[in-house]
Amino acid sequence: MIGRIAGTLIEKNPPHLLVDCHGVGYEVDVPMSTFYNLPAVGQPVTLLTQLIVREDAHLLYGFGTASERNTFRELIKITGIGARMALAVLSGMSVPELAQAITLQEAGRLTRIPGIGKKTAERLLLELKGKLGAELGHVPGTPAVPDSAVDVLNALLALGYSEKEAAAAIKQVPAGTGVSDGIKLALKALSKA
């Protein structure tokens, strides 16, 4: 297993890199979030990596942070999500944004990523619920979402309200409110809208 690579960045062509490590050039694919933070060609670079061995190829994927690599590893465990699709997900949104989308069960945000349809987005939400969101928390600058708010959101979605309507209604519910009272207050807010 190759867990990390450090060398000189020889070539950048999104999403591919060529990293010279003691005279050996390694081809590494990276998500765009990592690509945008790379140094200039000719400069030293260090990446955390994940080696994928297939029957026809050995593929090396690189990441700027441990959270990106851990998220990639969780994504490729999901049936129907290969390394390329996982890379597309990480290129489409940051890890904290993905964690928030999963915590809030926002399939609509995931379907904006090229190659992710409604069914794939729902599978991602189902498979990663409790894994990614719990591990990574919330997006900095936004309030943390308590479990009761997620339960209220899921209840409103089950009643047929859109994600946008449900999220707006939950904002009207005071923090620390229980699930049952939260649903009542959210429904009251929705009836006034």
UniProtKB/Swiss-Prot annotation:
Pfam families listed in its UniProt record: HHH_5, RuvA_C, RuvA_N
Stretch list, region Domain I: 1-64
NCBIfam families recorded: ruvA
Domain notes: Has three domains with a flexible linker between the domains II and III and assumes an 'L' shape. Domain III is highly mobile and contacts RuvB.
Biological role: The RuvA-RuvB-RuvC complex processes Holliday junction (HJ) DNA during genetic recombination and DNA repair, while the RuvA-RuvB complex plays an important role in the rescue of blocked DNA replication forks via replication fork reversal (RFR). RuvA specifically binds to HJ cruciform DNA, conferring on it an open structure. The RuvB hexamer acts as an ATP-dependent pump, pulling dsDNA into and through the RuvAB complex. HJ branch migration allows RuvC to scan DNA until it finds its consensus sequence, where it cleaves and resolves the cruciform DNA.
Subunit details: Homotetramer. Forms an RuvA(8)-RuvB(12)-Holliday junction (HJ) complex. HJ DNA is sandwiched between 2 RuvA tetramers; dsDNA enters through RuvA and exits via RuvB. An RuvB hexamer assembles on each DNA strand where it exits the tetramer. Each RuvB hexamer is contacted by two RuvA subunits (via domain III) on 2 adjacent RuvB subunits; this complex drives branch migration. In the full resolvosome a probable DNA-RuvA(4)-RuvB(12)-RuvC(2) complex forms which resolves the HJ.
The protein's name in its UniProt record: Holliday junction branch migration complex subunit RuvA
Species in which this protein is naturally found: Cupriavidus necator (strain ATCC 17699 / DSM 428 / KCTC 22496 / NCIMB 10442 / H16 / Stanier 337)
Phylogenetic placement of the source organism: Bacteria, Pseudomonadati, Pseudomonadota, Betaproteobacteria, Burkholderiales
